[in-house]
Amino acid sequence: MRDSKRVVLYISIMVLSIFIIGCGKGNEIKEDAKEEQIKKSFAKTLDMYPIKNLEDLYDKEGYRDGEFKKGDKGMWTIYTDFAKSNRPGVLDNEGMVLNLDRNTRTAKGYYFVDTIYDNHENSYSKNYRVEMKNNKIILLDKVEDQKLKERIENFKFFGQYADFKSLKSYNHGDVSINSNVPSYDAKFKMSNKDENVKQLRSRYNIPTDKAPILKMHIDGDLKGSSVGYKKLEIDFSKEENSELSIVDSLNFQPAKNKDDE
């Protein structure tokens, strides 16, 4: 009788163990599936990189939904910034945003220089208007600082030299999901041998040998949405309270009409 009870107890423990392991495996499969979906969602735009001539975007179709008015060819918005904290509590951030209207085949935007303090009291922000013609950035505002002027006129978006053809090789990411928004995040460890990392080190002052983290963020439907948003970040930060990263995004949305501004 005692032996039969032990057998029943043993079988119960085995069944429970299999159930727990099965649940764990199920969660792993779900996370792997979401990681793959996030990468596939990003691949729709990253497969276009490098976009050496930004004017090629005038002839590139993006994801369209009911937000687009009839006849609207849409607008590509490309963005790159470089953020660095040289002093505790202070973040210096420079970059450019450019809107390429496929209806008018014109590209306008601005270069920004921000100094952001934790207390926000002494924060500083300055925008310099730009346009693009013949794949060349043209500065529309007067800039006294010659070095800044050269940085603006010679600016290259990350998407102009980045190459993510090997995106599938980024594996075992840390995936997090907020179903309420919805939003999706995935983090992948990069290598200093990665060509994208080498490109960034050659273009920016990155005083650390630490291999960066690739962060992918999506707001909205994974399948695509004109009201959603995708952001790519390559984070070189050495510690939690320091900031050293490059942010990139390429999004397709309805073109803004004058009445909307």
UniProtKB/Swiss-Prot annotation:
For the lipid attachment N-palmitoyl cysteine, which residues are annotated?
A: 23
* Gene for this chain: lpl4
Task: Report the source organism.
Answer: Staphylococcus aureus (strain N315)
Q: Read off the InterPro entries from this record.
A: Csa (IPR007595), Csa_sf (IPR038641)
Q: Which family does it belong to?
A: Belongs to the staphylococcal tandem lipoprotein family.
Q: Lipidation, kind S-diacylglycerol cysteine: residue numbers? A: 23
List, alphabetically, the GO terms of the cellular component aspect: plasma membrane
- Reply yes or no: does the keyword Signal apply: yes
Recorded protein name is Uncharacterized lipoprotein SA0400
